[in-house]
């Protein structure tokens, strides 16, 4: 079972990352030295715990936004994503390519005269490759 981190460790790690994000790294020893410089931490053990959790959070931040940490960089990224309007729609309806079966289905529904629909040659599906032992009892 893992160790439980106290509220003090979590809170101080988040504060340090918010203020000194540009200086923090994914390396524990570097983060420990940075903490020594920027914060007054009463004990070596507490400093190491905060540095360890800060390193853990930095690794999580690399993967995506972390709850409880508001970084200006992440906020700008979020705003950019919200305001982004593509030049060209991802859903192009100028030319829709369908197989023979779908075209026949549309014809049966009386919708074969829709503009922009073209037929595409379908490829034969390959039989799936079987890996591992054969099913059933193994014979020698």
UniProtKB/Swiss-Prot annotation:
GO terms for cellular component: cytosol; cytosolic ribosome; cytosolic small ribosomal subunit. Transmembrane segments: none annotated. The keyword Ribosomal protein applies. Gene3D superfamilies: Ribosomal protein S17e-like (1.10.60.20). One of its GO terms (molecular function) is structural constituent of ribosome. The keyword Ribonucleoprotein applies. SUPFAM superfamilies: Rps17e-like (SSF116820). One of its GO terms (biological process) is translation. PANTHER family: 40S RIBOSOMAL PROTEIN S17, SMALL RIBOSOMAL SUBUNIT PROTEIN ES17X-RELATED. This is Small ribosomal subunit protein eS17x. It comes from Arabidopsis thaliana.
